UniProtKB/Swiss-Prot annotation:
It comes from Pectobacterium atrosepticum (strain SCRI 1043 / ATCC BAA-672) (Erwinia carotovora subsp. atroseptica). GO terms for molecular function: DNA binding. It holds the Pfam family SfsA_N. The gene is sfsA. This is Sugar fermentation stimulation protein homolog. It comes from the Bacteria. Belongs to the SfsA family.
Length: 234
């Protein structure tokens, strides 16, 4: 996924009200950015970090600039815009870069499914294959050399695990796809220390046949791309 035009840098002053962040540009201008990340953003929003932002040409937006990347003071790159994960996987599927998900001729997005009023991120279909339901999660929390999901208690994430497990029970294929959008993360684990119920449901879903895939990425102000498969820790 290319950033066009290229992202612009600023220094983070603070993030507040979950969806807003104040930054100062190299020219000394203070801007308020929109933040599309509803999580805790632990380690992704330290004052003094370099923020890379995009600018929308939509005149109706109150905050035209969006926080896309963080370049931390430890020299890690992080995509904090969680909306990008779905786009990255969609592009990778079109280019047949995810071996485990190759061979499908049709990709649908935001399709209603399940019994808890859910929408699946991606639905893969082909005449000779079982429908494949994919839920995409962005992983940005780095602790003790491991990436964890979630970074805060997530009732929505718990619901998605139940829905995926139900799809397997219905004879479908179900995949939980972790898009690792932090350059320092080399392995992934469910965050039992943050959301113990999510971790329990994760194990239940995995044992029921829900597939877990973890892929790393390359990140820079020109663009981001899913790259290599990463190991999953139990």
């Amino acid at each position: 996924m290319d950033y066009t035009p290229r992202l612009q840098p600023a220094r983070l002053i603070k993030r507040y009200k979950r969806f807003l962040a104040d930054v100062v540009t190299p020219e000394g201008e203070t801007l308020t950015l929109h933040c599309a990340n509803t999580g805790a953003m632990t380690g992704c929003a330290t004052p003094g970090d370099t923020v890379w932002y995009s600018t929308s040409d939509n005149p109706k937006r109150k905050y035209p600039q969006s926080w896309e990347l963080t370049e931390t003071q430890q020299n890690h790159w992080i995509c904090v815009n969680t909306l990008r994960a779905n786009t990255l996987l969609y592009e990778a599927l079109l280019e047949n870069r995810i071996e485990e998900l190759a061979g499908y001729s049709d990709i649908k997005t935001e399709v209603k499914y399940g019994t808890e009023n859910s929408r699946i991120d991606l639905l893969l279909q082909a005449p000779d294959r079982i429908d494949c339901y994919i839920e995409v999660k962005s992983v940005t929390l780095l602790q003790h050399e491991c990436g964890y999901f979630p970074d805060a208690v997530t009732l929505r994430g718990q619901k998605h695990l139940r829905e995926l497990q139900q799809m397997v029970s219905n004879g479908k294929r179900a995949v939980l796809f972790f898009a690792v959008l932090h350059s320092g993360i080399q392995q992934v684990s469910p965050a039992r220390h943050i959301d113990s119920r999510y971790a329990e449901l994760f194990i239940e879903a995995q044992q029921a046949g829900v597939e877990i895939l973890c892929y790393g990425s390359t990140l820079c102000p020109d663009g981001i791309k899913l790259t290599n498969k990463l190991p999953l820790l139990g």
